[in-house]
Amino acid sequence: MAYREIHAKWKADPEGFWLDAAGAIDWVSKPTHALNASRAPLYEWFTDASVNTCWNAVDRHVLAGRGKQPAIIHDSPVTGTKHTITYAELQDRVARLAGALKAKGLI
């Protein structure tokens, strides 16, 4: 889809456009409204929905067999070093951090 076509679709139905775009991620509970402008200029997106960000950013990639693929790449031009963290490694690190936060009563 070309830029003009995407822009025209957004212009014709902004609410529908963003709800369609929201379909690209997995939701715990799907949104029925895209933009909440009731407190403008403090806008809120997808206020009637719930999402697990870790699932969308990490877990689903491991489940899909991409655990050994890079999730984060740090390539430092200053030190000349490159460090990669795979999706599986990131999942483990996130789980350990969540466990530590829970043990401290923070979550």
Feature-to-residue mapping (PLM):
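Extended carbohydrate-recognition surfaces in non-catalytic/accessory domains of CAZymes
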Residues: 44, 48
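Terminal domain-initiation and capping elements
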Residues: 33-34, 42
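Adenylate-forming
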Residues: 4-9
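A short N-terminal helical cap/helix-turn-helix that marks the beginning
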Residues: 11, 16-32, 49-73
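Conserved catalytic residues of ABC-type ATPase nucleotide-binding domains
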Residues: 38
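Conserved AMP-binding/adenylate-forming core of the ANL superfamily
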Residues: 54, 72-107
